[in-house]
From Swiss-Prot:
Optimum temperature is 52 degrees Celsius. Its EC number is 3.2.1.8. One of its GO terms (biological process) is xylan catabolic process. Belongs to the glycosyl hydrolase 10 (cellulase F) family. InterPro entries: GH10, GH10_dom, Glycoside_hydrolase_SF. This is Endo-1,4-beta-xylanase C. Its main location: secreted. It comes from Emericella nidulans (strain FGSC A4 / ATCC 38163 / CBS 112.46 / NRRL 194 / M139) (Aspergillus nidulans). The keyword Signal applies. Disulfide bonds join 280-286. SMART domains: Glyco_10. The gene is xlnC. The active site is at 154 (proton donor), 262 (nucleophile).
Length: 327
């Protein structure tokens, strides 16, 4: 979530392009998106935000899926070897269960927010054992409670080569197969995703690498169900046609589904949000959208005001435009 692409406000299809901004309506984003043929409209959260009454009220009323922003990352769950801390993740999963929400698990294998005891491992067999044990413990604990798992996250550089990480350095690209096969065995019913950012143009080297490797891994029997495009955008200069084309190119790899997994857009222009909404609506395999937070004040990009609710938890024009477009 470092390099942010930009999105141009080019034409969206007619029913969305003409959408006027309306006052906030009672129907939830999730209900409206499901009525439009998709599986969910979600957000990210964690225990502290779910205990914030203003934030929680919006999560409860607007979204159908919750992604843990940080509580399921390796440093949160297993800060020292074999010592798991489940309280934050348990809280989120329990909240989702009690409020009839689903959960996207995020993330099992990632180079960042990785404890030093893992990143300093120097032996391939040790790392393989540590990685498979971590996946088995985490996925096994929440078996049957997680809709999607982001199994591997941000594994490519911008030029399409593999990112320098302890996983790739010791195990080569085989760490991807090991991670997915382990996750599949631990919970056969969860959809398994590979997730990354800057997958925003079909001609971009990173997008092409993702598509090429996923096709290769699927042909080799690696159980990848979906590709997640994070969609952290900057201002209005990136072609929405390219964004839609990129989503299509990911869908055409042979995966069963794709999703927009961490959406936020600097400035939160209504036209930009509608363009991404439209890209998912027009791609049959796009099952849903997750926005990366509720209120601008709690965003990792707070100064960019990138979300659908302002710092006072009030709906912004982009929220109203989405509701109107889907109504």
């Amino acid at each position: 979530m470092v390099h942010l692409k930009t999105l141009a406000g080019s034409a969206v299809f007619a029913s969305l392009a003409t959408a006027a901004v309306l006052p906030r309506q009672s129907a939830s984003l999730n209900d409206l998106f499901v009525a439009a043929g998709k599986s969910y409209f979600g957000t990210c959260s964690d225990q502290a935000l779910l205990q914030n009454s203003q934030n929680e009220a919006i999560v409860a009323s607007q979204f159908g899926v919750i992604t843990p922003e940080n509580s399921m990352k390796w440093d949160a769950l297993e800060p020292s070897q074999g010592n798991f801390g489940w309280s934050g993740a348990d809280y989120l999963v329990d909240y989702a269960t009690q409020h009839n929400k689903k959960v996207r698990g995020h993330t099992l294998v990632w180079h960042s927010q990785l404890p030093s005891w893992v990143s300093s491992i120097g032996d391939a067999n040790t790392l393989r054992s540590v990685m498979t044990n971590h996946i088995n413990e985490v996925v096994g604990r929440y078996k049957g409670k997680i809709m999607h798992w982001d199994v591997v996250n941000e594994i490519f550089n911008e030029d399409g080569t593999f990112r320098n990480s302890v996983f790739y350095n010791l195990l080569g690209e085989d760490f991807v197969r090991i991670a997915f096969e382990t996750a599949r065995a631990a919970d056969p019913d969860a959809k398994l995703y590979i997730n990354d950012y800057n997958l925003d143009s079909a001609s971009y080297a990173k997008t092409q690498a993702m598509a090429s490797y996923v096709k290769k891994w699927l042909a080799e029997g690696v159980p990848i169900d979906g590709i997640g495009s994070q969609a952290h955008y900057s201002s209005s200069h990136w072609s929405s046609t390219e964004a839609a084309g990129a989503l299509s190119s990911l869908a055409n790899t042979g995966v069963s589904e794709v999703a927009i997994t961490e959406l936020d857009i600097a400035g939160a222009a209504s036209s930009d949000y509608l363009n991404l909404l439209n890209a998912c609506l027009n791609e049959q395999k796009c099952v849903g959208i997750t926005v990366w937070g509720v209120s601008d004040k709690d965003s990792w990009r707070a100064s960019d005001s990138p979300l659908l609710f302002d710092g006072n938890y009030q709906p912004k024009d982009a929220y109203n435009a989405i509701v109107n477009a889907l109504s």
